[in-house]
Amino acid sequence: MANLKRIRDRIKAVKNTRKITEAMRLVAAARVRRAQEQVMATRPFADRLAQVFYRLQTRLRLEDVDLPLLKQRPIETVGLLVVAGDRGLCGAYNANVIKRTEERVRELQETGQQVRLYLVGRKAVQYFQRRSAPIAKTYVNLSQIPTAAEAAQIGDELLSAFLSEKVDKVELIYTRFVSLISSRPVVQSLLPLDPTRLAARDDEIFNLLVRGGEFTVERSKIVAAVSAPPPDMIFEQDPVQILDALLPLYLNNQLLRALQEAAASELAARMTAMSNASDNATELIRTLGLAYNKARQAAITQEILEVVAGAEAL
């Protein structure tokens, strides 16, 4: 009987755990949807910004533009902006970002370059603090869905470090959102900006859908409307001055998109992890149920044998 009670208690505990993991899966799905809506909300601004940059490039194509954010200089120190998460229970999401960061740090150090780390997310901060890494700045407890203000704060500090020559180059390491079951850490160069890549084409957005009772994601191409700038776009000021003022805005927009992609990747990883945990809990409950039934049948059989043996003794 003690064995039966132990199995019943374990089944109850696993069922309670399954309720938690299923709730976390649904919460993550809702937040992925919110992240998707935020990406869509920022698209008109990003498209218009691309149009302005394209027109400015057209005007300045034959000029030698000398702007601080476009200036290439010998690279002695590289700043790495690493975007991880504040929480766990999201599979290998944080571990993959940290692993890619360590690989990139080794690559840079092998070429004789120094590294300064700008860390987003408590998991990355804790990991690199334990290893006495060269941490320049940390950002923790950001919003579940990144905001433009948070991206601007990070962007301003990176700009300050670059313009003051504390770093000669800034790279971004974040997890690119591919699908609910697939994501990959990527390394992207942020500073100095490349004027040939300002008007980005073939951008992508993701759409969270429900098919057959399961969540799925579709990615679709967004071609920025930069090939035909509006004819009424007239620059009253010097185009160089306008470009100089808009470059920080462009950088902040790139950071916001990266933070949004990383947040969506983390939420998708958490959805997948919690879905797998729920499935494993269901299978464990089934296995424990079979074990409980076998133990109960064995107990009943034993009781019958004892009754029969007692009757024969009389």
UniProtKB/Swiss-Prot annotation:
One GO MF term: proton-transporting ATP synthase activity, rotational mechanism
Entry annotated with the keyword Lipid metabolism: no
Keyword GTP-binding attached: no
SUPFAM superfamilies: ATP synthase (F1-ATPase), gamma subunit (SSF52943)
Subcellular location: Cellular thylakoid membrane
Subunit structure: F-type ATPases have 2 components, CF(1) - the catalytic core - and CF(0) - the membrane proton channel. CF(1) has five subunits: alpha(3), beta(3), gamma(1), delta(1), epsilon(1). CF(0) has three main subunits: a, b and c.
Record's keyword terms, sorted: ATP synthesis, CF(1), Hydrogen ion transport, Ion transport, Membrane, Thylakoid, Transport
Protein's UniProt name: ATP synthase gamma chain
Membrane topology value: Peripheral membrane protein
Family, similarity comment: Belongs to the ATPase gamma chain family.
Taxonomic source organism: Synechococcus sp. (strain JA-3-3Ab) (Cyanobacteria bacterium Yellowstone A-Prime)
GO cellular component, one term: plasma membrane-derived thylakoid membrane
Stated role: Produces ATP from ADP in the presence of a proton gradient across the membrane. The gamma chain is believed to be important in regulating ATPase activity and the flow of protons through the CF(0) complex.
